[in-house]
């Protein structure tokens, strides 16, 4: 059914108003998403975000009409492909993403559908009558008859990820009441204030960023020191290393400066160190004696108090 010019104009105006109102949006894949799921997501996002759908050609045409005023939107054009929609928001991106991807439902396998994951049939009794054994044999599934029913003897990898589901595989899964797939909105790309990035970026925590920053700082410092090229990160280490070298040279030669005078004196006359350390040790002993006397006095006072009764 053809869309009228009036409807297109209204859609273009609606999209423009959303781009002007919101700073961020999610590009979401809506393959196999039911209308009921769409309604539920819209309801959960109400007051926080707005979901808009449309044909890709209409979305691109509307965006090209806005690019003159908002040139940063040109970065979004390449990601408008496939069965996608936009979720506009100014709220916390992580919270909105969780709401978008939380609404999923289990779905049966359909013939010719692309499997989003590997599908396994578990070992166990199927409850089916022996007459259907040939059906399992055709799919290469090992079985045996147990108490008049078919039993699968080992787990079977029935469908590989990204492969088409065959009619026989779909029939078997339905016969076993296995709904192997879950369908819901999938976030493909995030647009935020002119920047386009992968949704995995939202999973990077503040601790991860700090860890990467510290690791980078350590690497830069090591390279700077190794290349003897001073940087803000390495200059303190360079100064300390240079001072250590200067002290080593001073101790090995007759050159003396303020930082090595005392060390050289102690090395020349170790007994001077013993003499210098003695007053400090004596001062420590004198400080301990008054403390011991004070403790003894407190103990005596406590003992005297113990001799009085409540009404003495």
Swiss-Prot record:
Residues 286-312 are annotated as: Disordered. One of its GO terms (cellular component) is cytosol. Its main location: cytoplasm. Pfam families: Ribosomal_60s (PF00428), Ribosomal_L10 (PF00466), RL10P_insert (PF17777). The modification Phosphoserine is found at residue 302. Residues 295-306 have a biased composition (Acidic residues). Keywords: Cytoplasm, Phosphoprotein, Ribonucleoprotein, Ribosomal protein. Component of the large ribosomal subunit (LSU). Mature yeast ribosomes consist of a small (40S) and a large (60S) subunit. The 40S small subunit contains 1 molecule of ribosomal RNA (18S rRNA) and at least 33 different proteins. The large 60S subunit contains 3 rRNA molecules (25S, 5.8S and 5S rRNA) and at least 46 different proteins. The acidic ribosomal P-proteins form the stalk structure of the 60S subunit. They are organized as a pentameric complex in which uL10/P0 interacts with 2 heterodimers of P1 and P2 proteins. uL10 directly interacts with 28S rRNA. This is Large ribosomal subunit protein uL10. It comes from Schizosaccharomyces pombe (strain 972 / ATCC 24843).
């Amino acid at each position: 059914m053809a869309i009228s010019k009036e409807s297109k104009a209204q859609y273009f105006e609606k999209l423009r108003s959303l781009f002007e109102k919101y700073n961020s949006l999610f590009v979401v894949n809506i393959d196999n998403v039911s209308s009921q799921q769409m309604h539920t997501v819209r309801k959960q996002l109400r007051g926080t975000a707005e979901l808009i759908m449309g044909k890709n050609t209409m979305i691109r045409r509307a965006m090209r009409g806005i690019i003159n005023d908002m040139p940063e939107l040109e970065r979004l054009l390449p990601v408008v492909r496939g069965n996608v929609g936009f979720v506009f928001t100014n709220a916390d991106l992580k919270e909105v993403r969780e709401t978008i991807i939380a609404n999923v439902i289990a779905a049966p396998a359909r013939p010719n559908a692309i499997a989003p994951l590997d599908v396994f049939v578990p070992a166990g009794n199927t409850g089916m009558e022996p007459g259907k054994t040939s059906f399992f044999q055709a799919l290469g599934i090992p079985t045996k008859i147990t108490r008049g029913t078919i039993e699968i003897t080992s787990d079977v990898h029935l469908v590989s990820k990204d492969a088409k589901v065959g009619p026989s595989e779909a029939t078997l899964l339905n016969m076993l009441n296995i709904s192997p797939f879950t369908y819901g909105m999938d976030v493909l790309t995030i647009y935020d204030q002119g920047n386009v990035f992968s949704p995995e970026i939202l999973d990077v925590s503040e601790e991860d960023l700090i860890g990467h920053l510290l690791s980078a700082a350590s690497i830069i410092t090591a390279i700077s020191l190794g290349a003897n090229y001073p940087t803000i990160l390495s200059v303190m280490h360079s100064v300390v290393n240079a001072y250590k070298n200067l002290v080593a040279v001073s101790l090995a030669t007759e050159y003396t400066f303020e930082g090595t005078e005392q060390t050289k004196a102690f090395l020349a006359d170790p007994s001077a160190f013993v003499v210098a350390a003695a007053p400090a040790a004596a001062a420590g002993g004198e400080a301990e004696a008054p403390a011991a006397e004070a403790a003894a006095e407190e103990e005596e006072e406590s003992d005297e108090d113990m001799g009085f009764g409540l009404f003495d």
